[in-house]
Amino acid sequence: MSDRVIIFDTTLRDGEQALAASLTVKEKLQIAQALERLGVDIMEVGFPVSSPGDFQSVQTIARHIKNSRVCALARALPQDIDAAGEALRVAEAFRIHTFISTSSIHVESKLKKSFEDVLEMGVSAIKHALRYTDDVEFSCEDAGRTPIDNLCRMVEAAIKAGARTINIPDTVGYTVPTEFSGIIQTLFNRVPNIDKAIISVHCHDDLGLSVANSIGAVQMGARQIECTINGIGERAGNCSLEEVAMILKTRADLLGVHTNIRHSEIHRTSALVSQLCNMPVQPNKAIVGANAFSHSSGIHQDGVLKAKNTYEIITPESIGLPQNNLNMTSRSGRHVIKHRMESMGYAESSYDLDHLYGKFLTLADKKGQVFDYDLEALAFFSQIHEEPEHFKLEYLGVQSGSSVLATASVKLKVGQDLVCEAATGNGPVDAVYQCINRITGYEIRIDKYALKAKGEGKNALGQVDIVAEYKGRKFHGMGLATDIIESSAQALIHVINSIWRADQVAEQMERNVTKTDKINTESV
């Protein structure tokens, strides 16, 4: 049996299902490229049949990712598998992941079928997927609550049909470690062709046991773990990639296995996913929480000062957490910025140095001192605003006070034109938003508004995240500035630019459909 555990990341499929607002294609590609740098073996990036947008995202990622295998999900239905196969065709190598429920409650209550019907559907789905690729994964949904005899039959039939990987999900996070490990052990003991496939596990965290269940399964012979960055996912989330990766590394003495994960990329990848998905990481979260390497007890502090390994079993450096927080000023040159970015794990090709340096100088003039966390925030926001902006903030002014009606004046660049507007509102942010809505013509409803400091002290950058609804769709917007009113304006403009681009894509697709229909009519 191999001593390598395959890491199957499903942040962009199972993880994204938990988000209030869907990620854009560009944001999904950013995360996919980060996962590739991290060294995941397989990345499941969407469910192509679910929507044209998901199909496009899967296709775009499949076209760009070269060093990780791209995978798409499909129910055990021909149309799902065809959509996945078509979306993935552009990849150098890809996997189709098809699934069907196997527990009695799912088979009888959800599918309204017999287990024999489900068995036949699973086998047919695998054979259909093999038309597109020889790398087919099959999942027995709700395996944790499936009668063991039925589970053994399904696994044996799936392997015989040609599935290379068999996934055993604890779909509702119901099992405990000894129970789940026992299921894996029973499969190895009772399924005669088990050696012809890799056994995978996909554990949810409803009872807080997803990581423990996954590690226990590895001890019983499973060699693929399905997980997400920061453990994001439906309900209580999924098995956390960073936790299993560091467990397998730190306790290699006990577990005797390894992964291909580049552990120094963990912090950076976690931060990116948290930012783009608008899902803050809890401070006390293992590995990537803000307090993961903090010591407040006097006894602990004394021990760490004498020898770090008294209370630290892993180091901040091992996950890529920057330790040398050098302060920079407007007198710092480009070479300093480049050096600090390199020290934080950013290759020069991943950012525009001239653009970043310009943003740095502007911030340094406002703050005086700029720190690594400021620089990282600037780099991140430069990346998300790389696309041409149809609406751009040119000027913002507000007047407000305890006994003054808040008034705002805003000037936006709309295409090539400058448009001004003034408005009053229930506070300065509301007044600014009234101006922006009038200029752009979009009626936006703000569902969520969150403000957080990026950095330390009164001069910290203010980041604003909003979730907005427009015509039944949710959009996520972000803004960053030393002035929280300005960052609030940027966040709404970010949303409106996303809506505008989505409208442009929809119009183009409609024109293409009309053109195709016209050609078909003429040919008839």
Curated annotation (Swiss-Prot):
Primary role: Catalyzes the condensation of the acetyl group of acetyl-CoA with 3-methyl-2-oxobutanoate (2-ketoisovalerate) to form 3-carboxy-3-hydroxy-4-methylpentanoate (2-isopropylmalate).
Necessary cofactors: Mn(2+)
Domain Pyruvate carboxyltransferase, chain residue ranges per copy: 5-267
Protein family: Belongs to the alpha-IPM synthase/homocitrate synthase family. LeuA type 1 subfamily.
The UniProt record lists the keyword Cytoplasm: yes
Protein's name according to its UniProt entry: 2-isopropylmalate synthase
GO molecular function: 2-isopropylmalate synthase activity; acetyl-CoA C-acetyltransferase activity; manganese ion binding
InterPro entries: 2-IPM_HCS-like (IPR050073), 2-isopropylmalate_synth_dimer (IPR013709), AIPM/Hcit_synth_CS (IPR002034), Aldolase_TIM (IPR013785), LeuA/HCS_post-cat (IPR054691), LeuA_allosteric_dom_sf (IPR036230), LeuA_bact_synth (IPR005671), PYR_CT (IPR000891)
Source organism per UniProt: Aeromonas salmonicida (strain A449)
Residues binding Mn(2+), per UniProt: 14, 202, 204, 238
PROSITE patterns for the chain: AIPM_HOMOCIT_SYNTH_1, AIPM_HOMOCIT_SYNTH_2, PYR_CT
Annotated spans, Regulatory domain: 392-524
Functional pathway: Amino-acid biosynthesis; L-leucine biosynthesis; L-leucine from 3-methyl-2-oxobutanoate: step 1/4
Listed GO CC annotations: cytosol
GO biological process: L-leucine biosynthetic process
Coiled-coil intervals, chain numbering: none
Record's catalysed reaction(s): 3-methyl-2-oxobutanoate + acetyl-CoA + H2O = (2S)-2-isopropylmalate + CoA + H(+)
Keyword Amino-acid biosynthesis: yes
Subcellular location: Cytoplasm
Principal location listed in the UniProt entry: cytoplasm
Enzyme Commission code(s) on record: 2.3.3.13
